[in-house]
């Protein structure tokens, strides 16, 4: 039976990864955080938070920031009706950054998080609702990731890539492999069950990569069943000035 989100009693946290320094967008982001750039009439974070909040399943949004931009995020959070907690990871330069996986664990430890978690990058916009992804993950009852078909080999080399079976279960995941096995790319949107969120430190201790957010998921899929949902729309990645201009010109919101 397919459940509507309103029928689900689950409450979760949403952790937004926003501690990067976006050096490829300099000078635009030299003194301003990329997740607060405007796309249309809203910031990137507004698009993400307002959409997810519509499911009424997230009781707290957590923005993990570096020290350099923590005040920017706090000022933004103060304008929002949702409960938003900003966590400062203490870093001030790109060279001393913790990396996404260590940032996740840092936020978990600082706030004592022990819930299911939606973990997302704060520098992408989508033209579909993440509520569909939450519904998929709740029905699978496992940790989950999104996937989309990427035809260009050059882009595969810079991405997380998954191999799946006929039931969407992830068999393998690699980050930036020189020999990607498939064309299924994974953008940085993850759903972790409470049990699997407790294993992040174990993944770090086992040697999983810590810079790319998908590195923990790549380790996790070797430990427990996890699934990958095909994206029902498009993702717009803002990596440099040109891609930001392109997104500004083409993005039409969530539909």
Residue ranges and their predicted role:
Residues 72, 102-106, 132, 215-216, ...:
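Alpha-helical elements of Rossmann-like donor-binding domains used by nucleotide-donor carbohydrate transfer enzymes
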Residues 156-170:
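Conserved catalytic core of nucleotide-sugar-dependent glycosyltransferases
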Residues 134-138, 169-237, 241-255:
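Catalytic-core segments of class I nucleotidyltransferases/pyrophosphorylases
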Residues 6-16, 24, 38, 42-120:
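Conserved N-terminal catalytic core of the sugar/cofactor nucleotidyltransferase
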Residues 21, 123-124:
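Active-site metal-binding loops of divalent metal-dependent hydrolases
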């Amino acid at each position: 039976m397919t459940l509507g989100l309103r029928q689900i009693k689950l409450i979760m946290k949403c952790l937004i990864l926003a501690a990067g320094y976006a050096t490829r967008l300099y000078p635009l982001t030299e003194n301003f955080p990329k997740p607060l750039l405007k796309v249309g009439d809203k910031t990137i974070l507004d698009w993400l938070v307002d959409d997810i909040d519509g499911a009424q399943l997230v009781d707290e949004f957590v923005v993990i920031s570096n020290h350099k931009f923590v005040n920017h995020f706090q000022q933004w959070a103060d304008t929002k009706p949702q409960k938003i907690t900003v966590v400062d990871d203490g870093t001030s330069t790109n060279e001393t950054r913790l990396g996404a996986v260590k940032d996740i664990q840092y936020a978990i430890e600082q706030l004592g998080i022990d819930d299911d978690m939606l973990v997302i990058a704060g520098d992408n916009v989508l033209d579909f609702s993440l509520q569909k992804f939450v519904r998929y993950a709740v029905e699978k009852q496992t940790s989950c990731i999104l996937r989309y078909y990427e035809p260009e080999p050059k882009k595969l080399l810079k991405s997380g890539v998954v191999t799946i079976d006929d039931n969407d279960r992830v068999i393998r995941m690699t980050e930036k492999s020189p020999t990607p096995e498939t064309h299924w790319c994974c953008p940085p949107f993850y759903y972790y069950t409470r049990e699997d969120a407790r294993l992040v430190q174990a993944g770090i201790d086992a040697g999983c990569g810590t810079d790319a957010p998908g590195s923990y998921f790549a380790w996790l899929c070797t430990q427990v069943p996890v699934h990958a949902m095909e994206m029902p729309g498009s993702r717009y990645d803002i990596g440099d000035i040109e891609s930001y201009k392109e997104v500004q010109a083409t993005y039409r919101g969530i539909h």
